[in-house]
Amino acid sequence: NNPDGPKYPAGLEEKDLNKTVTRTITYVYEDGTPVMENGAPKVVTQEAKFTREAKVNLVTGEVTYGDWSEAKDLAEVKSPVVKGFVADKATVPTTKVTADSKDATEVVTYKPLGSWVPNIPGQPTNPIKYPNDPTDPTKPGTEKPKAPYVPGFTPKDKDGNPLKPVNPNNSEEGYEVPNLPTDPSQDTPINY
């Protein structure tokens, strides 16, 4: 019988035996404003929880810790497609974390997609936004609209090359737009 009772030293609290590592993914526009989803900023929070055991020497009060539970994977998170914008990352990749890993924050940034810009003399410009790729948030889509037909004008690309009519027998059906630039956030002029 121990009349003084066992010695329970410091170091056996919940925080000494449990640890959580968090990865927070935020989605923002170039100017820093958050991408909204259902009326709130879109944020993905992933957590990995780790535990370990402790043994107490009841005579000396010394605490010895076991190893933290094994490493865990925080799953890959696909970036959403945001209409009219391109993301700088298609995914935030899977990452392995241990109890010693620091909390992390990942930011996915969206830039506005550019437009085909018909420059028609005497008319206001009416830009045609590049389409989104429905599955890859980092790329524009492949569907192409038509450049408008304007009587008396032949539309040209930025290098002065005439655009091809959609229907070679009837240019009134419009013209094939030029290919997109390497950076899909840049506009493509169509000069008349």
Regions found by a protein language model. Name each.
Residues 1-192:
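Extracellular modular ligand-binding repeats in secreted and cell-surface proteins
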